Amino acid sequence: MAHEKFSIPENFTLAQSLQLLYSVVKNQYKNLADLIINSKGNKDTVTYGKIHKNLDTLLVYVNEGLRKIEKTYTLKKGLGNLVVDHPELRSIIEDFQILGQDIRIARRKAETLMAEGNGSPSLSSSSSVLGLGTGNGLRFPKLWRMGSKRDKLKEADEKEAKINKQADNIRRARKLEEEKKLGAKLQYERDLELQREKLIELKVKEKVEFEVAQKLEEERVKREEEERKHREQAEKKRISTLKHERKTNYKSRASLDNFSSSSKSSGKIDNSLIKRRSLDVVRTSGERVRTPVRKSMEAAEIGMAAQLAWSQYQNGANHSKVSNNGSHSNELQIRYKPTPPLKKRYDYKKPTVNRPIIKSPTLNRQNSKSSRNIPTNSKLKASKSNTNKVSRRNEQNLEPSSPVLVSATAVPAESKPMRSKSGTPDKESSASSSLDSRKEDILKSVQGVDRNACEQILNEILVTDEKVYWEDIAGLRNAKNSLKEAVVYPFLRPDLFKGLREPVRGMLLFGPPGTGKTMIAKAVATESNSTFFSVSASSLLSKYLGESEKLVRALFYMAKKLSPSIIFIDEIDSMLTARSDNENESSRRIKTELLIQWSSLSSATAQSEDRNNTLDSRVLVLGATNLPWAIDDAARRRFSRKLYIPLPDYETRLYHLKRLMAKQKNSLQDLDYELITEMTEGFSGSDLTSLAKEAAMEPIRDLGDKLMFADFDKIRGIEIKDFQNALLTIKKSVSSESLQKYEEWSSKFGSNGS
């Protein structure tokens, strides 16, 4: 070892070189330590001197190896500052510190044993010192101390004590870390054991429930079988009893007939029979004659016989054949007089309501005043209708959110249909028939617009079969409240929203894609009982010159006639982009016509209020876009409200996930839902739906080729690992840069206060 030097193999990295040096020194140290243990009983000072010298040589070997590593890998700052740039080498450097301490301890022990053999006190001389200096606690000295001069022993001892202290700290930190890892491992094993116990408990519970259900099913089948057998026995017993009674009656009659015939032929009657008297003297006084009796008679024949008897009685056909028996039959016929036929029931049919409007409170007061002047006879005749009115008012009061709806035509109040949110089939059919009749009336009296364009609007743009309610939309509480205040309440109670409280004529919903803007528009139309026009660019654009403008004009005309109505323009940025010099002439004409018709809504409302004192132009233009900054300035001015529809927050995502998984077989717990919700930060509503669909496909994929023969009930439920796998495929569709852009536009132009 004294003549050997550490050599670094080619293509070795810094970590590999340090590891090679450490393994060589570690093996040499183990051999010398074993030699000290084996020579402990021997007092040969020569052996201990060799061991002491070899340990010094080992320290010199380590020193030269570290210096060579520094030189080879050009470590200008030394190995002490290596951890700053290479934190992965901290462990090997700490191992060198601990190994240096072990070598010094072994050397001190060999020195002590050698001194005991010579009978002189040991000298704490050190020819070489392997340790780390002060500073960050990870700095190697440039040169290891060599030599054993007595004037430097004190300094060497102090330095060695400092190095030992650092090594002890490293040992203590490693011990604490190992204890911490051991504790974490034990805790993990305990958690696994608890989960295993819970799983076993659930399986046992499921098995017990299955066995109990199976046993109950067997008992039910057994009980039904016993009941069936009991019924069969009872039926057999009843049949046998009837047969026995019939047989007994037949034998008694036969014996009585035989007895009467024999008594007549002999002319002798027993004295016991003479003493017997019957209570029915009249019937028994005559001669007994047996006549064949019909055992059964059909109901139709009985009715025909009764009708025949009644007709004969009316015509007097029986008077010529009157006899004692005939008088008795007439009495029977008179006794059973047929009842007169019942009158047909009067079915009341409600008149068709053409258009529902709001009943004004002043009209109720006028009706109450006029009812006081009605004569008493008319009041008595109308008492029944008044009771119906009271009952219907009580029914209407059960729905505080819906106002009283009356017809625009002169229809009695008791015959006016109610529109409720539940939407029974009869009410929906009546509403659809009313809408159809209104459309026919409007098409018959079209003025100022093209009739064909109106028909195209009704066929392609009018939506009547989609019903979406507030409960179908998760979250977005602020947007719902703003829409209720700005649209729903004014449409349902226009008598309260007049003047400065007049409802807005334009509202813009903007935000990232997949946040539910289209569903909100449909929910507004449903909740406000409005006619819904869903407009897209393809429904208004035409290749013929001037046709697009006609369609726009017809759209607003039909919206006014079928008010209250909502014109919903999805992706409105495609139709109302900012105008420029390079724009096409046809698209500019469409924008101009759309803006003109839009501006006419406010003036049309004022004129209709002045003429008819009714609200016939409750029309709202509702737009949705993902690019609000691309809309023309004039169109943006007409949007009185601009609502930002953000991405769903934590609570909304949790509620949406639970609603998606409510009708799907799954084994998810509340903690699983919360974990999935945290993992889907930044997902939109459509992204969550796509994620749930992808997770629902995982149990199907596990079946593989067994899919065609698998039982649906035996397919496993959705687990949290399915969502983890789905997250590898489904990513969020909105970037943070896009969200920042939406928030900046909302703070600049949006209706933040609503």
Curated annotation (Swiss-Prot):
InterPro entries: AAA+_ATPase, AAA_lid_3, ATPase_AAA_core, ATPase_AAA_CS, MT-severing_AAA_ATPase, P-loop_NTPase, Spast_Vps4_C. GO terms for biological process: positive regulation of translation. ATP binds at G511, P512, P513, G514, T515, G516, K517, T518. Residues 317-332, 361-389 have a biased composition (Polar residues). The modification Phosphoserine is found at S255. Residues 219-269, 317-439 are annotated as: Disordered. Residues 239-250 have a biased composition (Basic residues). Pfam families: AAA, AAA_lid_3, Vps4_C. Keywords: ATP-binding, Nucleotide-binding, Phosphoprotein. GO terms for molecular function: ATP binding; ATP hydrolysis activity. The keyword Membrane does not apply. Residues 255-269 have a biased composition (Low complexity). The keyword Transcription does not apply. Residues 219-238 have a biased composition (Basic and acidic residues). GO terms for cellular component: cell cortex; cytoplasm. Present with 259 molecules/cell in log phase SD medium. Belongs to the AAA ATPase family. PANTHER family: 26S PROTEASOME SUBUNIT YTA6-RELATED, AAA DOMAIN-CONTAINING. This is Probable 26S proteasome subunit YTA6. The lineage of its organism: Eukaryota, Fungi, Dikarya, Ascomycota, Saccharomycotina. The gene is YTA6.
